[in-house]
Structures are given as C-alpha cells and as structure tokens.
C-alpha cells in the first residue's frame, strides 16, 4: 500500500475487540486477523484505516481500577486532533460499560455513545476540517463463561449487553448516524464470555 494514494481516512475507535484481544491464550490476534486490518486489506488504497483500540475502554466512564485512562470521551478529542482530517469514525464500545462497577446498564451506554457523537461533531478540527461521518457499532453480546474472573466482571451484564444493538440502532436513527450490529455476524467466545476468536474478529469486517 502506498500511503500517498489513500483517498479516505477511517478511524476505528473501540476497546479490546478493536485492539484484537485473543481469548485463546490471552494474547493479541495476529495483525491480519484484527477486524480493522481486514477492513484495510479489503479497501486497499481506497482508505487508510486507523485502529484506535484500548483494552477496557468505556464510552464515557472512569475505571479507577485501570492503569491507563479508559474513559473514551475524555481521550477522544486528542485522538481526533491526532488523526485529522477524518472521513469516517467507527465507534464500537459498550462491553466494558457492562461491568457492575462501571455502569452495568445498556441505557448508560446509549448516553455514552450520544456523548461521543457530540464530541466528534463539536470538535474544533484543524484547518477548518469538517467532522467525519459516524458509524455506531453494537458489540457482540456477552455470553456465559466458566472463567471465574471474567464471569465475575461481565456475567451480571449479559442481559443488558443483549439490548445494546436495538438501543444503538434507535440512537443512530435519532441523531443521523450509520449503524451496524456486530453481533449479527460475530459471537463472543465462551472461553471468557467477552472476546472474539480470530474467525469472529474477521467476520466483523466482512459483515460491515
């Protein structure tokens, strides 16, 4: 790929599902298996795909148990300024909001996604650039797992996570964003109940 020939720039803003956390082995998926990388391969020089995934990132909530800033709204302006100009921002967040000490409710994630859209649309971009188009993506629902640590963190939020797709779809209609349900093509691995194996990670791009 020749960078000078890219036509569009796409920001993929997310958590460990975008970073590429591999539930099998608790390591990181190979570059070519992460869904932003698969998207890049499919688009070729038509677009530059920027993967901004951080393990544990929430929509708008603080996680004081984390070693880095997981609040997606607080860090977003810096990321927008770093990568401007942007043509499309793809936001897939909400899974970590389901932790009981974070929010634990799908409606909270809706408010969080609304705030992220407001940040993107209201940001003071350099060189008078226009805000990018926005695609809201609902992450695959959480599922049951025998892993005791992940079950304690995410088990209470399974039912709420199943509501994210319909809630995000309604929000996208209300505020004029695109919408995609990643759960329509990918399922969380029962190994930890949250993350995606390589095949399901790649499937997000194909569905999108």
PLM region spans:
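Short secondary-structure capping/turn micro-motifs that flank functional sites
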Residues: 56-58, 188-189
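Alpha-helical cap/lid subdomain in secreted, periplasmic
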Residues: 4-6, 45, 69-207
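Serine-esterase "nucleophile elbow" of acetyl-processing enzymes
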Residues: 2-54, 60, 65, 78-82, ...
